[in-house]
Amino acid sequence: MSFVFIIMGIVWVIGFFLLSTQCSQKWKDIPEKKFLNYLFFSALGLRVFWVVFSYIYYTLNTGIPFEFSAGDSLWYYEESIGNRDSSISSIWNYLFVDTTTVSDSGYVFYLSLLSKIFGENILYPRLVNACFSATTVVLLYKLAKRNIGEEGGRIAAIFACFMPNLIFYNGLHLKESLMLFLIVAYLERADNLLRSKKYSIVSIILPAFLVLTLFTFRTVLGAAAVFAFVTALVFTNTSVIGNKKRFMLISWGVLAAFTLTGGTIVNEVDGYLEDRETNVENKRNTQTAKGNQWAKYATGTVMAPMMFVLPFPTMVDVDEQYNQQMISGGNYVRNFLGGFVLIAVFSALFITKNWRNLSFIGSFVFAYLGIVSVSGFSNSERFLLPGLPVLLIMAAYGITLLNAKNYRFIKIWYWIVPVMAVAWAYFKLGSRGLF
């Protein structure tokens, strides 16, 4: 890996742990309103800085303000600029009626609307995304507080504020920042609906609208969101969801499922699941053709059990993987926090046995990461990213559960993480015949 990316990775790691530790101590007892102000503006400041920095960095290194080997981001930009002079109804028909796929249509529609306001400017849409990303951190706090308590909620939100992977995508013209906002907004509103004693038309329509929007960003995300909602209805304790409310919401869920059945959305999800073996095989063949002779061992069956820890950091200087090298520090942080996630999962299932009250967010991350892990994208940071907000909540919960017994596991985990990183680098080098 180049010296620049090594330094960048070190800054990501040290910055995350230093800022998270200091802010967790300083902000733990301040009033909630003050905490949320600190949280939002800290998150916004970091993201705006990264937007400007990455704009300059990419322009100097690639000649354009887009990432290395830009593909999707350039397509999104060109599509939105092409739609700029069209009417909103024409853009809608083009994206949602004339095209055969729903996934990605939502983000192109969003960028097309921004292009009507900002023209061909590249920086302004990214700054808007930075605002959405900072809002995501606040929504994550509300979701986490409701599920794991005030202490865990603050830790999870602080993690999200300084998490490198959640900052990184604000500097790109990709859908990830807005998609993460929609995910957390849906989870927060749907969780509120499930736990509230009273509900209104608006409280039902808003999460329904958000989940439909998720289908237009990544179809499997929408499917995982619906699955999580139904799972929570079935398994959550009656003290949280009354039987009458459970019946009404299940009826609504069944009606929504029938509405979606037979449409383009379900066809795309079915196709994604049916093609999972093809995805794995094609990826394996591609890697083998590039000289990766060990690719056959990186199957979904092998990688799926590690879905709470993946992806591993890329420390090997491989052509066309510069973006992965830039975010390697963030992946290392994810690997480290995975130890606390494992404590949280084990505790919820076998010690505190409160998994029913965590079934909504838990089933979402299990469903989504499970599908991705067996579909040929098990170490793809970008595909695993949508599960990160919930993993941060689980990691924060694991930290609140620390005691002398499980801390012994974490001390061992301190050594496991760097060993896994080196082993992955060894795998990549050896598979290419470089030693």
What are these language model-derived features?
Residues L18-Q25, L127-N147, F340-S347:
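Transmembrane-helix motifs of polytopic, lipid-linked glycan transferases
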Residues G71-E120:
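Short hydrophobic/aromatic helix or loop-helix immediately within or flanking a transmembrane segment
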Residues G171-L178:
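Short acidic/glycine- and proline-prone juxtamembrane loop motifs at membrane-interface regions
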Residues L123, L140-F162, L358-S359:
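Transmembrane-helix signature of polytopic, membrane-embedded enzymes
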Residues L18-Q22, F308-W355:
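Hydrophobic, aromatic-rich transmembrane alpha-helices
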Residues L44-R47, L206-F209, K353-S373:
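Transmembrane alpha-helix segments characteristic
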Residues R146, S196-V202, Y322, A344-V365:
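Membrane-interface helix-loop-helix junctions at transmembrane boundaries of multi-pass membrane enzymes
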Residues F168, L194, V202-A225:
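Membrane-interface alpha helices of multi-pass inner-membrane proteins
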